[in-house]
Swiss-Prot record:
Binding site for Zn(2+): C143, C146, C156, C159
NCBIfam families the UniProt entry points to: metG, metG_C_term, PRK00133.1
Source species of the chain: Bordetella avium (strain 197N)
Protein name, as recorded: Methionine--tRNA ligase
Keyword entries, A-Z: Aminoacyl-tRNA synthetase, ATP-binding, Cytoplasm, Ligase, Metal-binding, Nucleotide-binding, Protein biosynthesis, RNA-binding, tRNA-binding, Zinc
Length: 691
């Protein structure tokens, strides 16, 4: 039965060019969309630029241009990347559009009418020079715990402490250097903690769509249980501040002059705005297409770093605005290079534009990513040696090799005509069965399984061809009898029919190459669809070169050379290194190995865990740590960690903290939102001092 699908990828933020992570997500979605279309389904595949927010406003101001001009500059780059990698969106739009304004207003008004918008007066730091309220990332100061300088307004990168911006010592604006002042402002909150939202999300996150497809992968569902609680657990959802004060580049909130939607509210609405723009363009009824009762399936491809917004806020917003909720979130991991996080300074950064500029085939990358991606939330590793081997061995050595060998015999001896001995029904059925297995794997997003099956099938075709030894039959062809000629023609015809079937299987992954195969080699008038695999070809044109091998020197050119040691990255971890200290200063800090004897949540705190530590002193210490968002208490019990043992005890609202455990985090949550508690290597014992 034919299905109708509305498919999106996460919206790229319009203050920079595409990076390889964007391209990976777009290729994954594009392969899936092409596969669904080949099955006869109707797919509306749209994207857009995420064009609002303070970072865009401030970057444009720094460059002396308008935010719209900055967004337009990056929007103009998009086709070069998308076309370059054969990524075929139906429509590309912007959140800075009339459609997005109208839809954001409609959704907000519906949520307000449902009693899910609440106004609260909050106190924030305000930059008197800039004349704007400051987000945490734009406030710096001295950490109230370890007294490290130049720490951001919500957490310390040195000691891992989490705090409110008002707790910073000598805070200053990262924009102007001015001392911020506290100022009150009315903000609008979406009441995600409302029992109606909690009940809906507990059902939606564990549910399936009308086709029985789970809304969430098992890993994502498990993550949402941490926020929603299980059957016996209590939900830990906080209400969401959806407003920002002027000056702000965004969509003004209805009936609230000087108040704007926070970018994370109008950004996902941009999915709908892009579809609305596309529907208006081609004459489709947008409202009917996305009516809650319609059969349209709404599918979002996103990265694992934005699960919270897409699995909680987004479906709840849509549900209580009376709109269709998502049918599936397809979440993927990050991309690494040779097992490491990409880094320009280490020469492991991949620029998608550079990939194209050095002359590398975009379909090499599409194939390689398909060979590595699956339906789980796993990181994909790009290994240069593996990349070369897979392309040269699989695509050229196995797949293309079939056509180049068999077609030459057919064109030289049979004028391009194919003929088969015996009953061909079994051969057609075999192709149909194998192709259906590939189609199902691609629909399930098990791309790596599909590629393994395709290459195993190619191995079988090559082995059968080699075993038949057509080059022996071709010797003395002019004097050969009809039986021998027919046998040669049959062997090569079957190999080429197999090559055609393989091309159908690979069509979603290699759209440009398989289009040439369909049209130039087999004389088709259109690109392949799944059912074409079972139709045995009757004629081929002379073989033309299809794909070159990867030259290892291309990989050398792809990776940017490591930065000179004399010029390291100025802000590792998102911030500059602290001032140099002497060894005498360092030894004043007593760092000890400590074992976590117990760990529990702190009632009344959304950030803190209470750790009971054994530091080899014959007694236990009580330490509070702001790591609740990233660790379950039961997962920490029994672990070793690092304790600042001689830090003066600090009296807190919840008790006395007798030291500090060390943790690492990045200054910019958009780069890495995690907090990582330090854990010594096995063998270290509680009480050992770190030197």
């Amino acid at each position: 039965m034919s299905r109708t699908l509305f498919v999106t990828t996460a919206l790229p933020y319009a203050n920079g060019s595409f990076h390889i992570g964007h391209i990976m997500e777009y290729i994954q979605a594009d392969i899936w969309v092409r596969s669904m279309r080949m099955a006869g389904h109707t797919v509306h595949f749209v994207g857009a630029d995420d064009a609002h927010g303070a970072p865009i406003m401030l970057k444009a101001e720094k460059e002396g241009i308008t935010p719209q001009a900055l967004v337009a500059r990056y929007a103009a780059e998009r086709p070069r990347y998308l076309d370059g990698f054969h990524i075929r969106f139906d429509h590309w739009h912007s959140t800075d559009s009339a459609e997005n304004v109208a839809l954001s207003h409609e959704i907000y008004r519906a949520l307000k009418a449902a009693g899910l918008i609440e106004t609260r007066s909050i106190e924030q730091f305000f930059d008197p020079v800039k004349g704007m309220f400051l987000a945490d990332r734009y406030i710096k100061g001295e950490c109230p715990r370890c007294h490290a300088k130049d720490q951001y307004g919500d957490s310390c990168e040195v000691c891992g402490a989490v705090y409110a911006p008002t707790e910073l010592i000598q805070p200053y604006s990262a924009l102007t250097g001015a001392t911020p002042v506290l100022k009150r402002s009315d903000h609008f909150f979406f009441k995600l903690s409302d029992p109606r939202c909690v009940e809906f999300l507990q059902q939606w996150t564990t549910g399936s769509n009308r086709n029985g497809i789970k809304h969430l992968q098992s890993e994502v569902q498990a993550k949402t249980r941490e926020w929603l609680g299980g059957e016996e657990g209590e939900a830990k959802l906080g209400d969401w501040d959806i407003s920002r004060d002027a000056p702000y580049f965004g969509i003004e909130i209805p009936d609230a002059p000087g108040k704007y939607f926070y970018v994370w509210l109008d950004a996902p609405v941009g999915y709908l705005a892009s579809l609305k723009s596309y529907c208006d363009k081609i004459g489709l009824d947008f409202d009917a297409l996305l009516d809650p009762s319609s059969a349209t399936e709404q599918v979002h491809f996103i990265g694992k770093d934005i699960i919270y917004f897409h699995a909680l806020f987004w479906p709840a917003m849509l549900k209580f605005a009376g709109r269709k909720t998502p049918d599936a979130l397809n979440v993927h991991g990050f991309i690494t290079v040779s097992g490491e996080k990409m880094s320009k300074s280490r020469g492991t950064g991949i620029s998608p534009l550079r990939y194209l500029e050095v002359g590398m085939d975009p379909e090499w990358l599409r194939y390689y990513m398909a060979a590595k991606l699956n339906a789980r939330v796993e990181d994909m590793d790009f290994n240069p040696e593996d990349f070369i081997a897979r392309v040269n061995s699989d695509l050229v050595g196995k797949y293309v090799n079939i056509a180049s060998r068999a077609a030459n015999f057919i064109t030289r001896h049979f004028e391009g005509k194919l003929a088969y001995l015996g009953d061909t029904a079994a051969l057609s059925a075999e192709f149909a069965q194998q192709t259906e297995s590939i189609r199902a794997a691609l629909e399930a997003r098990e791309f790596n399984r599909a590629i393994r099956e395709i290459m195993a099938y190619a191995d079988g075709i090559n082995q059968a061809f080699d075993a038949a030894q057509p080059w022996v039959l071709a010797k003395g062809f002019a004097e050969a009898d009809e039986a021998r000629r027919a046998q040669l023609q049959d062997i090569c015809s079957r190999a080429l029919a197999g090559f055609k079937a393989l091309s159908v299987m690979l069509a979603p992954v290699l759209p440009a190459l398989t289009s040439r195969v369909a049209r130039d080699l087999f004389g088709a008038q259109r690109d392949f669809i799944w059912s074409d695999a079972a139709d045995l070809p009757a004629q081929v044109a002379p073989f033309k070169h299809l794909m070159q091998r990867v030259d290892p020197q291309m990989l050398d050119a792809l990776f940017e050379p490591p930065a000179e040691l004399a010029a390291p990255a100025p802000t590792p971890g998102g911030e500059a290194l602290a001032d140099t200290i002497s060894i005498d200063d360092f030894v004043k800090v007593d760092l000890r190995i400590a074992k976590i004897i117990n760990c529990e949540e702190v009632e009344g705190s959304t950030k803190l865990l209470r750790l009971t530590l054994d530091a080899g002193e014959g007694r236990h210490r009580n330490v509070f740590s702001g790591i609740k968002s990233f660790y379950k208490p039961q997962d920490l019990i029994g672990k070793l960690t690092v304790l600042v043992a001689n830090l003066a005890p600090r009296k807190m609202k919840f008790g006395v903290s007798e030291g500090m455990v060390l943790a690492a985090s990045h200054a910019d949550e958009k780069v890495d939102a995690g907090i990582y508690v330090l854990e010594p290597w096995p063998g270290a014992q509680p009480g050992m001092r770190i030197h």
